[in-house]
Amino acid sequence: MSVFNEIEKCGELHSSEFGFFNVLGTTVGTNGYQGGDAGHGGRTYICFEDLANTALEARVSKGEYGNSKVEILLGGDSELDCIIESLRWAADTLESIANPPRE
């Protein structure tokens, strides 16, 4: 599945900035629950962006069994504060815009 040509399927994207001694931009979007796996059309997007002085590294690789793996490494106390706030905001935002799961 090539996801990046399907970002528009996530609907409206929501963005926020988190800053202390650095600024971390976070963007999320989802078209909510679609009744199953990726073949059913559900898409969720999350992006972290260094907007100012964020010690941020990311790596996409294959795990031990060929599965996808995403690693994010941040350096510094301010970055720790920012990622905590960013992840909390991202989870709350995704939860609020996702339609209820189907029974």
What are these regions (language model features)?
Residues 1-103:
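Positively charged, low-complexity terminal tracts
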